[in-house]
Amino acid sequence: MTPKTPRPPRPTTIVDAPRLSKHLGVDLVLASETLQYTGSFKFRAAYNVASHVKQSHIMTASSGNFGQAIAYACALFGKRCTVVMPASAPKIKVDAVREYGAEVDLVEVEKKSRLERLGELAKQFPDAYVASPYDDPLVIEGNAGLARELFALELDLDFIIAPIGGGGLTSGLVKAVEESGKKIDVLAAEPLLSNDAAQSFRAGHIVALAEESNTIADGARVLRIGDNNWKILSDGLTEVIEVTEDQIKEGVRLLFALANLKAEPTGALALGAVLAQPDRFKGQRVCCVISGGNADPALYARLVEGI
């Protein structure tokens, strides 16, 4: 049931995981967005978009989490919502988008990209607002709220690590850090199989992948970082850490076994970055943003069992 009064985003859940910290040799803080409305940090951005734009119809392309988030946010504000999703998206995410009241347009990404299909729909509905899951100032500002919550808790952090796809979350974090004047390094964790952001930082300009990858971290299957995001990240982000598929899987398993947290593969990327560079973070105060928990049940069961 949709509440009569729109609900703003929930504060992030801070998890102290002493067993996981001991296992890694890191003073670890987990900022879990798995209990956020719609199960991921994406609701922060979606709420900010739906509450600010005047259009009554919002369209987007999403691998799932932003689709769920914008669908629910649109329902809160009485707006129509259309979400273009890859046909390969986890069924749990497709079903959830529909259950929140949005129309889902599935596309075979091997034949046509999500953005191409979104462009076609935008021509059909010229009065609709086309929301990028990441390349939108309203999205970036919505995500910045997460860092501001961390600052209010005075956690004395050395690093904040967050997953990166298009750059919406990390650019929001960097924006908030820069505005605060705090000396905290913001790092991005990216699948090695979908490393457009890492390639971009090495090249000094945006590099696009030729096609979407098949990384298990489906929320990071993007072709390139966003223009608005690059403007912020190119100067403010400390580094992009590339994470292997095995490290992503191990991150999911460790969060379950040692922190009692259910994270989807994309949500475990930040912990995967710690696994990728263990010596760098020894003894450091590190906040890993666990960005979401919308895992396909069958896949999740295999991951936690180490299959």
Spell out what each predicted region is.
Residues 1-307:
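PLP-dependent amino-acid enzyme catalytic core
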